[in-house]
């Protein structure tokens, strides 16, 4: 991962600011011959789109994606639009930028935001809506992820919100069907009901709250991952940590593994039907030695509470003067919610990349 | 990060297997003119060296480093050996490889180890001592880290073990001086005393236990980090996750941030003496928007229990037959202990790399 | 250089096909605070634009560039638009695509073109106007080059056509002023007059002809270049060879150096005024050991004749049947002409990249 | 290509100075399961080894390679040593360094050498035998090339010297068998006889002379190459230009193509037996649009005369004082000779890399 590009053979370069002309990405290295329509990408973008419930920002962006390059159709493709192996550029024009008065955030450093650090690094900053540091950039990732999914049709990637504030779900209630049926991408219907009340109160307070997201990839063949410094878990950790507001990433049992003894942590094996081991547990989260084991790849990450809140906080401005600050504007009370489709996209990109890398160096996948 | 290389301008490529001829690394991109003696590197290696207490593997390796290239001294350097800007190759020859009977691990897949996944990926595996997947590779990282520290002389990097099994230290007792005075790199003298008894029991049981390590970098100037996909925290997450047996990484408050409300998580600011903000808290762990804030960079990571234990576990062998397995040999009952100097090395490498990157694209550091 | 991205700290990713929706690039790693208007880029694009004389393709493309991201202006910038250090996306929409009948090139492999090889590699091909393999892609390079020039304001980069077909210019007549005054970018007025007659005849024959271009960068400080595999000349060779139809690249005396004896090839030195050597000759073309010497960097490259000609050539079609083929459509009789501004752009990008890399690893430039 | 690493999936990182402890490389990304013995590598190194005739430097280096990692053998491999997919570190210890008086080159800038530019870049320089800028580094490339050849067993790579000073060979006399039978790697026996007399005279004069080398790869399948910025010819151009003293690179007809008309340059096609086109000519040198066509890949490059000569040349020293300088020591009168096996190695590495990249992104090779 480097600057605004990630991936090695399946490479994604994103661009764009929150209130600029457009944002988007170039997906380079996508194999040729895959069916890809704008609608495939739009469907994923719509899941992430703001303004779909009262629990996400009220900014209204259609987030309409345009494919600028890298696909082709003619009579020989039977009318289907196929990837050609050349770079796929995707663009989403910004429409609802509200060219309002930005003087407040122009001069002030909002606590928890990247205002001060961008100024410290670059000496200049597009402060409108957070500029490049806005979570709006993740729309480009979701678009890229939709392409990545085409590369790995045998792999199912799903994510869910498993904790909001201090309230974890009851894993016994886990039902993937539920994820699409509440505004929180929550797999536990009971927890979702609780979150509704809880987040309404947070929202009315002008406050915000953190969350934990879990991403699961099923159908990952054993053998993906490039030890030592392109380990599958290392790449996933970087991918998830690069999402806005993420402060922690764990694989399988994660931090809980530290408290275990070796006997309890070992994923025992029995003979499987297909000639490969059947694991009796998955503490490892599907990755051993940086390489996938064939078990579901399980990643969790923590999102901090949205930094924009209505309670006044102490801060300073660009001139070093001390100020008290509240952050007006349209914001997500729990930015973790919209991180759910973003997490799926990052998982898809990493797995697509490692699939191509494995095939390149080790021949076909097992 | 890609395959066996990490870093962008300060680049480290490691090589070597646990029981091969030698292991080491090539450090590419180190600035010229830095004083570097083998002793500087050796001092760091000695901290990681096995066999220093009864709590780490009894393998006896002197881990003597040789500098093969990239340094120079003559009368004009006043006898000091200086880096020249060319690649610095470092080699550590293996001596205590015990060419014993490996038939057991040759054919069996040890639970929790990378035996099956390396076979699945490569179809062949140097099983002696774990081969490339052995934590012995981290000696090369520690050597590279010693070079990295030369690049960032104003930054102090220290790590400590803050949890062993279920037993966290009492942070009120934190004393960096203690870290060098017990075999656990533990900053809490009282906890260290407890660990001694606790780990002795684990060791005698032939069992093992996990740990949590915390790494802190002080004196990091604001402005380091390359958004969006080379964020400082994303690179640190990948760096730590690439260490053997690590299952989780967090920055600042990490997973605890998920349970906070926005008011509690915001690091408020007041005017500082040096013209930059003084932060009243550091929930963010020194990183905002992927860029360092000037506050201490704080990273924690979880290490799973050593997978090699004496309790029989169910497994399969290469031929798919079911077996019961115990893992004999010399092992660390808590592999997290020796991860402490490794974590410092990875932090040093990442910060050296980002220092050079920032200087390249944004001019001098603030 | 890798896939559709080149550069290391100053990185350019291009996208787009000849007859697709749009083409463009993302310039990543551009330092912040540089004044950049669309007009700056447009001026360079206009030099490369087709249809400006009867000697280039009659395709009419306004080649209007849009800056989608990475720049910012407000009252604090005094109305000037500045780069922000974030990725600069540039887009040029295709307008004159002539959705005509492509059935001929759809099924046939035009000799000298990339039709067969793209099919062999990808199994699918956007054949309209050559798709991704069209020289139209170089518009994106020229746009990126305009940004690169901002990074290296002290360096003057100029290119010229120095040979058309078998007719080399007379170097004694070299006058940079002439380059802008004839449709060939030719620095020798007399040769330009000859080329007019010569190329008219070629054009009327439905034939085409090759060319040699020379690019010169003056004001390059000594010290740029990253030995061993990022040598300045190696990067320039790759950059120029990546331009469509280029078949050879040389630095300084180039191939002529093979015929020299050591005494004649050595660039002798005398004391310079500024404390650095003054070179008495520049056979080396400004690069020694892969590092700039402070002398002008001189690169020449050969462009093959345009492959699209009206004389029938033997070929085969996709089905393997033998055919005779002429290539109708709008084409440049000497594609080398429009390679002149492209060459300047590539030189600018490589020098900008190496300037940042040098600054990163070696501190400020000498 | 970046710093001291080249390649993307098949990656080579070299290290070492002319008179340092050792030089070598790490080959990363080599597929597993390939038979590789030190003898395979040694055989290639012996072809490049100095001191084999009076026409190359009299330095006596056994250039004995050691494989430090990345290979494995046991009873299951039938005693054969196989690659394991992990990094292959290769080391050649320096033995004949002659720790003589270097005071002359320590303080002086030898014309044509990298002395001044390394000082300008790094401010410090290992001047012993040229340090990192010595052609001794190419031993590491030859070693890596021997590994690369294992990756592409169906491809035959051969190089030859085709011009020495002003004397080109007669291509009608081309006989690959001759290449191993004269000290010049010359395929024309008659030219070789001439070179013997010619180079003897050059040598006795204390002078030197340039050369042109041609490298040919046969059996390259169509489809290798990664447009736009990882084109096969662009990568080859960088690879060859990175060899010491190279000043020009061309593919196929190269610079001669500039003088051709389109009709003469087009490589016509007829139906082939294997379903792919049979080309009637190969002006393109086996590459169209940056992708291999299945025809032999033909690359030529020019090597300047060795800069170390016994005729005094004007120069300056580190302090800026003007001096006259001759370069004593052991040198090659025609450094192009030993570039022949180096060129083969670079071709092998580039083709191995592109073979893996193609397989990764486009499935199996045609």
UniProtKB/Swiss-Prot annotation, chains A, B, C, D:
Reactions this protein catalyses: 5-O-(1-carboxyvinyl)-3-phosphoshikimate = chorismate + phosphate
GO CC terms, sorted: cytosol
InterPro entries tied to this protein: Chorismate_synth (IPR000453), Chorismate_synth_AroC_sf (IPR035904), Chorismate_synthase_CS (IPR020541)
Key words, A-Z: Amino-acid biosynthesis, Aromatic amino acid biosynthesis, FAD, Flavoprotein, FMN, Lyase, NADP
Pathway where it operates: Metabolic intermediate biosynthesis; chorismate biosynthesis; chorismate from D-erythrose 4-phosphate and phosphoenolpyruvate: step 7/7
GO biological process: amino acid biosynthetic process; aromatic amino acid family biosynthetic process; chorismate biosynthetic process
Obligatory cofactor(s): FMNH2
UniProt xrefs under PROSITE patterns: CHORISMATE_SYNTHASE_1, CHORISMATE_SYNTHASE_2, CHORISMATE_SYNTHASE_3
Binding site for FMN: 132-134, 244-245, 289, 304-308, 330
Cofactor note as given: Reduced FMN (FMNH(2)).
EC number(s) given by UniProt: 4.2.3.5
GO molecular function term, any single one: chorismate synthase activity
Pfam families per UniProt: Chorismate_synt
Binding site for NADP(+): 48, 54
Subunit structure: Homotetramer.
Database matches in NCBIfam families: aroC, PRK05382.1
Family named by the database record: Belongs to the chorismate synthase family.
Free-text function comment from the UniProt entry: This reaction introduces a second double bond into the aromatic ring system.
This protein's name: Chorismate synthase
The species this protein was found in: Methylorubrum extorquens (strain CM4 / NCIMB 13688) (Methylobacterium extorquens)
Taxonomic lineage of the native organism: Bacteria, Pseudomonadati, Pseudomonadota, Alphaproteobacteria, Hyphomicrobiales
